[in-house]
Amino acid sequence: MKIFRYITRNTTKQIPCFGIAITDESFIRFNDICENDISEKISIIDIISNPLLNDKITHILNSSQIDKIKTYKIADVQLLCPLDKISSLRDAYAFRQHVKTSRENRGLKMIREFDNFPVYYYSNHNAVSGPGLIEISKRFLEKLDYELEVAIIIGKKGINVTPSEADAYIYGFSIMNDFSSRKIQMEEMKLNLGPAKGKDFATTIGPYIVTKDELSDSIIKTENGNHYDIELSCTINNIKYSSDNLKNMHWTFSQIISQISKGTMLYPGDVIGSGTCGTGCFYEINSSKNISEHIWLNDGDKVNILTDKIGNLSNEIKII
C-alpha cells in the first residue's frame, strides 16, 4: 500500500486528504475505501496505529471490490508530506561510505567507535514538508546541501525492542531529504555538539509511505535484521550526482530501532532516517579528486531523489 496526502489543484476548498496509489498515475481516495471507519479529521497516526483498518484496506485492494471504486489521476492533485503529524524525527548515521568520506573531508580518520553501536540525532519535526516548492531562508544559503536518505515510520508503541523484534515496529518507508547548511553546521560542530541550527530548518519527506509488505521482494535477511535492495539516486537540475543502494547500510533499521528504544518509548508516527547514503550529498562529493570546483545548492535548483521501489521525491528551492 502506498499512502499519500494531497490537495486538489485549482479548487477554493484546499482541504488535505489521504489517497492510496493504485498505479504510478492513478489513485483512490482514502475516504472512498473506508468512509465508515474514519472521521474527516483523521491523521496519519490514526491510520498507521490501527491494524484492523489496515487489514481491511489491504483486503479491498487485493479483491475485486477495488474495481468498483472510482480512480483519480495523481497528476491532477498536489502532493504533500504524507505525514500530517510527526511524533519525533530522528536521523541515524548508518552508511559507512558517507561517514568515512565526510570525515576525510575534515582531515579526520574513520572513527573506530562507528562499529560499536548506531548513533542518531534529533532533528526538527516541525520543519518537515513534502514534494514541491520549498522555501529556505537566505541565512542558510551558504554551502546549502541536500542529503539522500530513506526514512522508516514507526507503527506501534514499544520500549527495549530487540533487533529480532524490531521489524514488527516498522509501518512503512518513505524518501527523506535532510537539507543542511554546511557552513553553519561545521562552525557548530567545532564545539563537539550537534548538528543543531545547520540542520534545523528544512527536511522533506514523501511522496508516499510505502508499507513494508510492498517491499517483501527487496528484503535481504541477516542475523542483524533486514537489509533492503532498493536503488537510490539523486539529480540536481537533471544532472545525476548521487547513486547508492539501501542494502549498503552498515547498521540495519532493526539495529537502529533497538538502540533508540533502550529505555525510551517508541510511538506511532516516529520517523527515523537512515542517514545519508554513499555519495548522497555535495559535502561528500566535493571531496572527490574529480571535482575541481565545489558545488552547492542555489535558488531555483530542482532536487529529484529517485528510487526503484518507494517513488521519487522532487523539490524546487526558493530562497527567501
Per-segment meaning from a language model:
Residues 38-44, 250-262:
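Short, surface-exposed linear segments at secondary-structure transitions and domain or protein termini
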Residues 72-73, 132-134, 286-288:
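Short gly/ser/thr-rich secondary-structure transition/capping motifs
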Residues 1-34, 197, 203, 207-210, ...:
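Charged, cofactor-coupling segments
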Residues 257-268, 279:
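Extended, compositionally biased non-globular segments
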Residues 83-257, 294-295:
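Glycine-enriched loop-and-adjacent helix/strand subsegments that border the catalytic/binding cleft
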Residues 268-269, 300:
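Loop/turn positions that initiate beta-strands
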